[in-house]
């Protein structure tokens, strides 16, 4: 792959603007050398220069490039985000080198969440792969392309555990499970940062949003979070720590309050936990405008007080507001903020710049000027093969009645739906520098797959939504939803006519990407009514109906599950989404994705997640009882459980075999199963291992994921899959907030999803 190739570009500092002779050189990238270097640099800096390093400025209408260059010249800026071309980045770094007193380099950051120019599946889709090699591919390609654009840092990965699909930002994360999110977040950090964020094609990561942003009440964006310390540390904190233990150089602090205190002013969170308990040495960055928002939170009385509270609480860099530059000089002069506190924040910023290699070469991610691409969006800069490979693994087959799929590449195929030919929507939210015109739609992918062997007829069929208020909301800043001026009846009639002349109907339905984004919380997680009407009309034709879902959250699909012959969950699959979806629809690739979030039957079930507590009156479907934990108007469990996903073949999992009946605290026990492909074609599935602490000092979840492995088998082939279990897999935060495992019986569940499992057991001595 080209992103693995060594380019061998050595940038001579002699070719760049004049540098401070004692600042730049071949500095060893070690903590000891860094600390000594930064200590000496701090001695040379004025108060204003120190404060300038704490400012993270966004390029945009409020801060045009020309105005920012003046700030840079005066040493008022430490870093820039939302500039994504080498040419623009080079000009800004030139300003530092040419005009600023100390020539301390800027770093440049962007939201590279699931790709930079090549857009991969959204993170929720990537989690569906249950494949860490796929995560590594996304991380390395994303870092390569970001660094090739001159960027030094990404605001990723997002590791907020979310169990509420009403929340729009769940699309950015890895789902409901702590273990899966931790594992994927850790892998993404390692892939993006490589051996060092100073490497030419690596970038520094910023784990976000610290902390528990995915648990906002009611799934409502920016809302409050309130939970016990046991739940916080058991379920929500581990993914952040996993990313930091993997070496992430930065943490983005959440916008929400946690147990009554905004994260931006929470010294317990940012100092006691992050710095003292976890030993984090990197930078903390406020989220967009969060310091200003402390006033509305009610924990600061005015702008000056907000700055004082934020800095003293542990916020190093201020994102996209002018408060630090306006109010810190006076606070330092008055002694309300000490010089030691200012130096500490500045030191953290200088440390990460050192770790990025910027004091060795401020242009390290830019290369020589004559190497800048003539066309920033050139096709040659994309990594389409990798995008297609990963996208195929992210797709989840939810239903396949009477083997409706795979389709034949013959006859007539109707492709309908408002998302079938949407280049923008297939990329999903937070698509970085991706260009919509370079993405492949489902319609294009199907046409390419069948060539001249089949006839494809297309009809839009419906708008994403006919609710004018929702359209206005979604289109407030960009045209996220395009509205067809035809009447709903005209559009449905066209789709029905297309269906009647076809052998099978593929309806591409769900959400516009803007509906699963920041500030896109929903109270109704069904498919919009305009599309439900379309589906009903298509069902009435009697033709086989395949639903291809595009969405950034679990949807309530009870009616659609009854109507459709097959359902394929594709999330937002990225640049090569259309081709990947066609690969699965026609059987060129056997689907193997699994759900990283449970799909509720209705919004009233939320939160519904697999690792719940048993309660004192658990519901037993085999022996229903009124006085148990249940709903009387809806089934208890989800429509599709966590870890669920079908294949075009079938698998049999044997009984669980334990290597020993007991486990010593310093030992291991192994749980094994034999997995057989009992179908007629090669396929892959994800074998999942869950653990349950049967009796403990606190009520424990009915099961918790503690291992998974994707296995590919030929027809009739059998493989043994083994999972080692040690005491760390059994630990939890008890009532005294001690992290420990308690002796006693443990159940082990292994299967192809969280519901279909076989059981083993052992005892911890």
Q: For the regions a protein language model found, what residue spans apply to each?
A:
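Gram-negative bacterial Sec-dependent N-terminal signal peptides
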Residues: 1-19
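Glycoside hydrolase catalytic-domain context in secreted enzymes
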Residues: 20-734, 740-754, 761, 765
């Amino acid at each position: 792959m080209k992103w693995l190739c060594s380019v061998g570009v050595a940038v001579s500092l002699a070719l760049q603007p004049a540098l401070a002779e004692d600042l730049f050189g071949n500095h060893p990238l070690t903590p000891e050398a860094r600390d000594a270097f930064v200590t000496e640099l701090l001695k040379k800096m004025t108060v204003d220069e120190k404060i300038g390093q704490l400012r993270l400025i966004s390029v945009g209408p409020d801060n045009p490039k020309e105005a920012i260059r003046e700030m840079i010249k005066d040493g008022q800026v430490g870093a820039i985000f939302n500039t994504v071309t080498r040419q623009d980045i080079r000009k800004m770094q030139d300003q530092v080198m040419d005009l600023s007193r100390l020539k301390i380099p800027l770093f440049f950051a962007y939201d590279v969440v699931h790709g930079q120019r090549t857009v991969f599946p959204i993170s929720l889709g990537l989690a569906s792969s249950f494949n860490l090699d796929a995560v590594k591919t996304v991380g390395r390609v994303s870092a390569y392309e970001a660094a090739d654009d001159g960027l030094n840092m990404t605001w990723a990965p997002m590791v907020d555990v979310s169990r509420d699909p009403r929340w729009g930002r769940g699309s950015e994360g890895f789902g409901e499970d702590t273990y899966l999110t931790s594992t994927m977040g850790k892998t993404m950090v390692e892939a993006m940062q490589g051996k060092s964020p100073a490497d030419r094609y690596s970038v520094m990561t910023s784990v976000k949003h610290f902390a528990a942003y995915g648990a906002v009440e009611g799934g409502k964006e920016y809302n409050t979070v309130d939970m016990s310390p046991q739940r916080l540390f058991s379920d929500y904190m581990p993914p952040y720590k996993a990313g930091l233990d993997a070496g992430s150089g930065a943490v983005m602090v959440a916008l929400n309050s946690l147990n009554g205190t905004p994260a931006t002013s929470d010294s317990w969170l940012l100092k006691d936990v992050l710095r003292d308990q976890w030993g984090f040495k990197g930078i903390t960055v406020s989220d967009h405008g969060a310091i200003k928002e402390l006033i509305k939170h009610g924990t600061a009385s005015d702008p000056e007080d907000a700055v004082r509270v934020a800095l003293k609480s542990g916020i190093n860099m201020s994102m996209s507001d002018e408060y630090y530059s306006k109010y810190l000089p006076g606070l330092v002069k008055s002694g309300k903020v000490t010089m030691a506190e200012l130096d500490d924040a500045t030191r953290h910023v200088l440390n990460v710049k050192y770790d990025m290699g910027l004091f060795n070469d401020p242009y390290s991610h830019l290369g020589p000027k004559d190497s800048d691409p003539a066309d920033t969006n050139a096709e040659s800069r994309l990594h389409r093969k990798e995008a297609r490979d990963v996208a195929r693994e992210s797709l989840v087959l939810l239903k396949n009645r009477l083997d409706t799929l795979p389709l034949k590449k013959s006859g007539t195929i109707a492709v309908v739906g408002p998302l079938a030919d949407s280049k923008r929507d297939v990329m999903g939210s937070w698509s970085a520098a991706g260009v919509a015109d370079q993405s492949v739609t489902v319609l294009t992918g199907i046409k390419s797959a069948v060539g001249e062997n089949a006839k494809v007829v297309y009809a839009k069929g419906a708008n994403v939504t006919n609710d004018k208020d929702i359209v206005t909301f979604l289109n407030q800043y960009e045209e996220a939803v395009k509205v067809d001026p035809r009447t709903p009846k005209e559009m449905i009639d066209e789709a029905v006519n297309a269906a009647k002349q076809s052998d099978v109907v593929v309806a591409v339905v769900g959400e516009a990407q803007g509906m699963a984004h920041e500030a896109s919380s929903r109270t109704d997680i069904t498919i919009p009514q305009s599309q439900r009407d379309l589906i009903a009309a298509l069902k009435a034709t009697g033709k086989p109906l395949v639903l291809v879902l595009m969405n950034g959250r679990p949807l309530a699909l009870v009616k659609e599950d009854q109507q459709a012959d097959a359902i394929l969950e594709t999330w937002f699959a990225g640049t090569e989404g259309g081709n990947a979806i066609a690969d699965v629809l026609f059987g060129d690739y056997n689907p193997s994705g699994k759900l990283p979030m449970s799909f509720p039957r209705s919004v009233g079930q939320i939160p519904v997640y697999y690792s719940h507590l048993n309660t004192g009156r658990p519901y037993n479907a085999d022996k229903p009882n009124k006085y148990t934990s249940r709903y009387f108007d809806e089934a208890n469990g989800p429509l599709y459980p966590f870890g669920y996903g079908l294949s075009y073949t079938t698998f049999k999992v044997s009984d669980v075999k334990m290597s020993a009946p007991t486990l010593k605290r310093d030992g291991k026990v192994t749980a094994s199963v034999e997995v057989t492909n009992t179908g007629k074609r090669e396929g892959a599935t994800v074998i999942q291992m869950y653990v349950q602490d049967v009796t403990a000092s606190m009520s424990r979840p009915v099961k918790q994921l503690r291992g998974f492995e994707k296995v590919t088998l030929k027809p009739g082939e059998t493989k043994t899959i083994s999972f080692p279990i040690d005491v760390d897999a059994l630990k939890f935060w008890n009532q005294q907030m001690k992290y420990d495992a308690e002796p006693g019986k443990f159940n082990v569940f292994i299967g192809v999803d969280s519901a279909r499992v076989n059981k083993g057991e052992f005892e911890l001595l």
